[in-house]
Amino acid sequence: MTIFLDIDGVLNQLQGNYHLEDTCISNLSLLCNKLNADIVLTSSWRLGYTNIGKSSPQIEKLKKKLSQQGLTIKGRTKNLNNRVKEITQYILDHNISTNDYIILDDDQTEFTTPITNLYIVNNKTGLTKQDVKTLLKRYR
């Protein structure tokens, strides 16, 4: 399973630049562990991510917080200026089947064309335990 992850509004409550909520990260960890899922960044944060050398301070903070929960970032989508195209291209490049991914995002407007397995998180709460329960019922 692959989780395509937006950050702002999913791992925080849109409370300012580059803020991360431990509760939201714990909920993501629970979801990833139950589904044996890898994380692929779709967030604009991904532009600061690199496998070689040091990433941006925000990504380093994210990697540290994820690591504390036993999670790592497997990859990131390319910058094609269209979230649907970026995710679709990653799915094609990595031969991911329709039943083997979830898209977590808080912004429906990023998805101008229909895409399967999209789950919209309330950006006032970030990812909650109830979201995790709903997703586990749907994808387990």
Which residues does each PLM region occupy?
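Alpha-helical substrate-recognition element adjacent to the catalytic core
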Residues: 2-81
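C-terminal cap/substrate-recognition subdomain and adjoining C-terminal extension
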Residues: 60-140
